[in-house]
UniProtKB/Swiss-Prot annotation:
The lineage of its organism: Eukaryota, Fungi, Dikarya, Ascomycota, Saccharomycotina. Involved in modulation of rDNA transcription. It comes from Saccharomyces cerevisiae (strain ATCC 204508 / S288c) (Baker's yeast). This is Regulator of rDNA transcription protein 15. InterPro entries: RRT15-like (IPR052997). The gene is RRT15. The keyword Methyltransferase does not apply. Keywords: Transcription, Transcription regulation.
Length: 62
């Protein structure tokens, strides 16, 4: 299992401090990663897609 911790401080009102911990559970034979997010504070003013953005950025760094 691989854990990746990232922090982002955005100056905008809609994206306060976000701490993400991504745990890579395993990689399937097709190359798709399965993961889970932990330690993500509620973001009532943020669109849900923001988490997908961070996941894609982090996973593409491999």
């Amino acid at each position: 299992m691989v854990c990746i911790h990232t922090e982002n401080q955005n100056q905008g009102d809609f994206y306060p401090f976000v701490l993400l911990e991504i745990s890579v559970l395993h990689e399937s034979p097709l190359g798709h990663l399965r993961y889970r997010l932990t330690d993500v504070p509620p973001q009532p003013n943020s669109p849900g897609e923001i988490y997908c953005f961070y996941i894609n950025c982090i996973m593409n760094r491999r």
